[in-house]
Structure formats: C-alpha cells, structure tokens
Amino acid sequence: MAGSADELVSLLDLETLEVDLYRGAQARTERQRVFGGQVAAQAVVAATRSVESRFVLHSLHSYFLRPGDTTVPIVYDVERIRDGRSFVTRRVSARQHGRPIYYMTANFQVPEPGLEHQDRMPEVPSPEQGMPLVELARSRGPEAAEHWEREWAALD
C-alpha cells in the first residue's frame, strides 16, 4: 500500500515538547482503543532519544494500565533513572487525559561480547518466501482484506 511506510515512520516520529517530554500522534483507525504495540514503540522511541547513540536497547518491561483513546495524542514523559558508563536506565510514562495508560522501564547497554543464553535460530524460510499478510486476508474474503488494509497495512 502506497504511503504505509511513511505513515508508520511519521507515527514513530515523536514531537519534542520539552527535554524528555514527547507527544505521539495517533494512527488513522476505526478501533476504539489504541493498539498496544503503537504505545510501546512510541515509548521506546522516547526513551532512545534520551540516551547517547553508543547505547542500544538491552531489555524492557512494560505495563499496560488503561486503554488508550484513539482521538487524543499520547504524551511520553521520560525519567532518567540511571546514567552509567555501560548501562543506562529509563522509565517512560505514557499519559492521556492526565492519567497514565502505560509504563515502561528500559535498560540500554554499550554493546560488548558476552555469554550466549539462547539457542541459535533454526533455519526457516525468509520473509520474502512467506505469504504477504494482505494476501492471507484476501484469501478470507474482500471484507477481511479491506479491513486489514485500513487497520494494519502500515505495519506490514
């Protein structure tokens, strides 16, 4: 779908209101509540903007507290918990109507070699070899495809 990537990029390009305070735009949607992945992604962007570029996201913990309102922008307040040489910690509060809808604690680390704590990824077909989601929706009928295009095309 033309413009979908641009729409996603603009959704993740938060407006800076003040130091460590950002406003996130809302996606065009027919849903009654904000998609949780949107809130989490915008919170990661807000936290990332408060750390030096040498740090990468290492871990995060999220708490979805209330449903988000799709008609109102979300304000992200970043709190700088810790600034170390190797690790940085941020807490992000996403707010609407003066109340928190989401909390996230994110840890960033300077990349370094270390122990591997997981198995290697098994050999699987590449994404290009899989069926595009829009085709899967079309296989379920024109209404499903139309709904998918409206709501999710920017994320595909």
Report residues per predicted region.
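Terminal targeting signals and extreme-terminal segments of soluble enzymes
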Residues: 1-156
